[in-house]
Design a protein with these regions (language model features):
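Active-site acidic/histidine proton-transfer and metal-coordination neighborhood
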Residues: 76-182, 255, 262
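Long hydrophobic alpha-helical segments typical of transmembrane helices together
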Residues: 222-228, 233-267
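N-terminal pre-domain/capping segments
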Residues: 1-109, 115, 167, 178, ...
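Acidic-and-aromatic substrate-binding clefts and catalytic sites of carbohydrate-active enzymes
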Residues: 34-36, 57-72, 92-102, 128-134, ...
Length: 268
């Protein structure tokens, strides 16, 4: 079953960013919406027609979090037979002591939205600071509180920069949360000479994945992508492979087909 992140279709969706999607108010990223973009309520049917069975949805692609709108989107997903695999909450810094209380409350409201949408998981950001054992414990405590308050949605974190910028910190965070929080492994976030070694140290802990291939004007870095996928497969991973495309070519659907073919070449 094909899975995709809505970020991969940001251009298809008219580059829409909700005007109140930031913790501090206003949009969480710069950019202007373009006319003629696909409405989010029409995305489930578009996914169905192209063979996708599940979606990871960026929070800023939601134009409204009213109960009525969330209900409409849940019905549209159900009618198309598309599962909401993960709500990706793409703002917030739990590691910032001046903002952490406000961020935790804000994330709690997004977890309520995830529950209303029937999402299986919600991915939360941890923070931009350098990791220390004390900071990891503090952030883990906040994540555990959020998980306890929202048991109907599984919280996952991602191997990103900052607090979770290396395998040791990711493993420490999962250990400190005592199983209350899972891992979304992103194959494109890390680089450098130790990339595959670092991915190998966390791959067996992952329950969902961003299958992200780097693209340039000359095409995909297929060698790196295949190597990353093999690391995942050799660790016994059998969860979703959510396709992530953010390369220069505007033909997002075609590039997603290419990524899917590369995934099948490794996973079958």
């Amino acid at each position: 079953m094909r899975t995709v992140s809505s970020w991969s279709l940001h251009r298809t969706l008219g580059r829409f960013v909700a005007p109140d999607s930031s913790v501090s108010g206003g949009p969480c990223m710069e950019g202007s919406a373009e006319p003629g973009g696909l409405a989010l309520l029409d995305l489930p049917e578009a996914l169905r027609r192209r063979g996708y069975g599940s979606l990871q949805l960026c929070h800023f692609h939601l134009p409204s979090t009213s109960p009525a709108y969330l209900g409409q989107l849940r019905l549209a997903l159900a009618a198309a037979g598309v599962a909401l695999e993960t709500l990706l909450v793409d703002d917030g810094d739990l590691a910032d002591p001046e903002q952490a209380d406000r961020v935790e409350a804000w994330m709690g409201r997004w977890l309520e939205a995830a529950e209303a949408l029937g999402a299986t998981r919600a991915r939360l950001l941890v923070g931009r600071a350098d990791p220390t054992p004390a900071l990891i414990r503090v952030c883990a405590g906040r994540l555990k509180r959020l998980a306890e308050a929202h048991p109907r949605v599984r919280i996952v974190v991602e191997n990103w920069a900052g607090v979770l910028g290396d395998a040791r910190s990711v493993r420490a965070m999962l250990r400190e949360t005592d199983g209350a929080v899972g891992l979304l492994v992103d194959l494109g976030n890390w680089g450098g000479p130790r990339k595959y070694e670092e991915l190998g140290r966390i791959a067996s802990l992952a329950e969902t994945c961003h299958a992200k291939c780097r693209f340039t004007e000359s095409g995909p870095d297929a060698q790196d992508f295949r190597h990353s996928l093999r690391v995942l497969k050799e660790a016994g991973y059998d969860g979703p492979l959510a396709l992530v495309y953010d390369g220069p070519d505007d033909d997002e659907w075609a590039k997603l087909d290419l990524e899917h073919a590369l995934c099948r070449g490794v996973f079958g």
